[in-house]
Amino acid sequence: MNIAILFGGSSFEHEISIVSAITMKKVLKKSTLTYIFVSADRKFYLIDTEKINSKLFSSGEYKKGKQLVLKNDGFFTKGMFGSKQVAFDVLLNLIHGRDGEDGKVASMMEFFNIPYISPRLEASAMSYNKLYTKFLAESLGVKTVPYEHLSKNGDRKISMEYPVIIKPVRLGSSIGVSIVKSEAELDYALDVAFEFDNDVIVEPFIDGVKEFNQAGCHTGDWELSIVEEPQKEEFLDFEKKYMDFSRDSQVLSADISEELKNNIQVTFKKIYDPLFMGSIIRCDFFVVNDEILLNEINPIPGSMANYLFPDFEGMVWRLSKALPKEKNISIDYTYIHSIQSAKGKA
């Protein structure tokens, strides 16, 4: 199978996307990979799979590659004798953050009739914005961590007790995130967060909370990852998350009861189906007093959370054959013809 990897984008997580994309070479070994890079100024470049490495992008060498245009049914190179389509079977969206997770890529792929693995438009909107994720969870009967919402031009007062954690609403990878232990630290933390976003959510910082990650998709049958208990530190900053996104070897399953595992997976399915059909997502959960709370939805997890699956590549192949399809609309202009006919008789 030929899989196009779309990565980069005009995003604060641009570099993490590059790391995720390079990692796919180690993971999708049986597939033919076609790399399509989106520069910070949103131009498309075809990248030589054999030559892809991080320096290619930091040095600007990627600009020597073929520039692509997006048209109906795919990406095309431009030449003296016309355009040539870039061949692939399915596109894997690996743009983290803005462009990739906010619905822009989903909209383009749908509009230009390109098969793709990624959340669709509505799912992107609900999972990219942490505030909307809270609303989604509430509508599904899934409990979340308590929160308050602050806007850049609004009041900076919070009512919950310290310590708290400040998160930009539309960012991942711990960018702009701070733990605030007292009121004296609040203004600075908000200044940092508002550098990246106009809205933040404030949540209680729960010291020593049990955290579990569950990834999966639906390919006609449920394909769920192991339940992972990630490394426990007070806070995983951007650097640690950056390294985390390059993982390519499977991790061990969390040592938890079968009942807790089943409850986490039932909650995951409730979130995934039907909104996230056609995508591989990861949900991060907290367990507090035996209660499962949704922390975040990762619509395009780092390196696609490949390390949580025993057969990630096989799953990608199966998912590519089970993607949701838009209904074709037949337009025959009957209404306009009837108006024209009526006018002709008048």
UniProtKB/Swiss-Prot annotation:
ATP binds at residues 161-212. This is D-alanine--D-alanine ligase. GO terms for biological process: cell wall organization; peptidoglycan biosynthetic process; regulation of cell shape. Cell wall formation. Its EC number is 6.3.2.4. Keywords: ATP-binding, Cell shape, Cell wall biogenesis/degradation, Cytoplasm, Ligase, Magnesium, Manganese, Metal-binding, Nucleotide-binding, Peptidoglycan synthesis. Belongs to the D-alanine--D-alanine ligase family. Mg(2+) 1 binds at residues 284, 296. It holds the Pfam family Dala_Dala_lig_N. Residues 134-340 form the ATP-grasp domain. GO terms for molecular function: ATP binding; D-alanine-D-alanine ligase activity; metal ion binding. Mg(2+) 2 binds at residues 296, 298. GO terms for cellular component: cytoplasm. Its cofactor is Mg(2+); Mn(2+). It comes from Sulfurovum sp. (strain NBC37-1). Pathway: Cell wall biogenesis; peptidoglycan biosynthesis. It catalyses: 2 D-alanine + ATP = D-alanyl-D-alanine + ADP + phosphate + H(+). Disulfide bonds: none annotated. It is found in: Cytoplasm. Binds 2 magnesium or manganese ions per subunit.
